[in-house]
Amino acid sequence: MLMPKRTKFRKQMKGRNRGKSFRGNSLAFGDIGIKATEHGRIDSRQIEAARIAMTRHIKRAGKIWIRVFPDKPLTAKPLETRMGKGKGSVDKWVMNIQPGRIVYEMAGIEEELAREALALAQSKLPFKTKIVTSESENEIY
């Protein structure tokens, strides 16, 4: 599972997930990728599940780049615990996703196979996405 090696503080406040993505919103490594079209939050398990689905479909051919990293701790209190007594312990690591963010990129395989693999990955993600290529990338969200 993806998570930071160390952080300055163990726990963070929730914050707000607003606006559009101004960084990481264009294909940088591959020829085809997945772009988020709405706000959401992705955790390390979802990133890994989508990666495994893509890798199995392309039978380890080509190359996959993961363009997101979960660096925000999400806390949870144990089940059947009364409120109070402080903030819960870190449960999982997440990343806030804004519209326009590239999540995965692929290269080195034919486009039809890549589209099938990316469609499998799209079903594992908790927000709406679209498949973009280097030609279709300049379209509005």
From Swiss-Prot:
Organism superkingdom: Bacteria
Keyword Ribonucleoprotein: yes
Pfam families xrefs: Ribosomal_L16
GO biological process: translation
Region (Disordered): 1-22
Annotated keywords: Ribonucleoprotein, Ribosomal protein, RNA-binding, rRNA-binding, tRNA-binding
Cysteine pairs bridged by disulfides in the record: none
Biased composition, class Basic residues, residue ranges: 1-21
A Gene Ontology cellular-component term: cytosolic large ribosomal subunit
Any GO molecular function: rRNA binding
Subunit structure of this chain's protein: Part of the 50S ribosomal subunit.
Its biological purpose: Binds 23S rRNA and is also seen to make contacts with the A and possibly P site tRNAs.
NCBIfam families given in the database record: rplP_bact
Family: Belongs to the universal ribosomal protein uL16 family.
PANTHER family referenced in this protein's UniProt entry, alphabetically: 50S/60S RIBOSOMAL PROTEIN L16, LARGE RIBOSOMAL SUBUNIT PROTEIN UL16M
Protein name: Large ribosomal subunit protein uL16
Gene behind this protein: rplP
